[in-house]
């Protein structure tokens, strides 16, 4: 994949989440302008852009046609555990707590959370 561009409802709130999350995974800030920002790792980059007012409604919902979630590689199970603690400490919503860290199934060690627009984000440890 080359890049993904997400339109967001609140650029600053999304910048705080994605900036922190991606930097924890080794991404570096790549581009920045008044209505957007991107982070890059290796040959892939993720872009967030402030959606214009006429396009803020209806709110995003992952069960509609389109994007369900974004999944990222973790370095280890320890990184998944550490990120779970940090997500909680920062007040972000961790999903599927009752099945964590195996909400994706047996042998699928991951944390699922939501960004400020409720886009589901997954961080997956390498499988054995």
UniProtKB/Swiss-Prot annotation:
Signal peptide residues on this chain, from the entry's feature table: none
Disulfide bonds: none
Domain VOC: 1-126
Superkingdom of source: Bacteria
Record CDD domains: VOC_BsYqjT
InterPro entries (UniProt xref): Fosfomycin_Res_Enzymes, Glyas_Bleomycin-R_OHBP_Dase, VOC
Protein known as: Uncharacterized protein YqjT
Organism of origin: Bacillus subtilis (strain 168)
Name of the gene this protein is made from: yqjT
């Amino acid at each position: 994949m080359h890049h993904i561009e997400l339109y967001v409802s609140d650029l600053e709130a999304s910048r705080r989440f994605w900036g922190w999350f991606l930097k924890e995974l080794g991404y570096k800030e790549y581009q920045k302008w008044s209505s957007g920002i991107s982070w890059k790792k290796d040959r892939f980059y993720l872009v967030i852009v402030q959606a214009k007012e006429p396009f803020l409604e209806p709110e995003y919902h992952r069960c509609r046609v389109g994007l369900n979630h974004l999944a990222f590689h973790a370095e280890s199970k320890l990184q998944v555990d550490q990120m779970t603690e940090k997500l909680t400490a920062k007040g972000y919503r961790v999903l599927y707590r009752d099945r964590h860290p195996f909400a994706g199934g047996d042998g699928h060690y991951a944390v699922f959370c939501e960004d400020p627009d409720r886009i589901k984000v997954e961080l997956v440890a390498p499988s054995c």
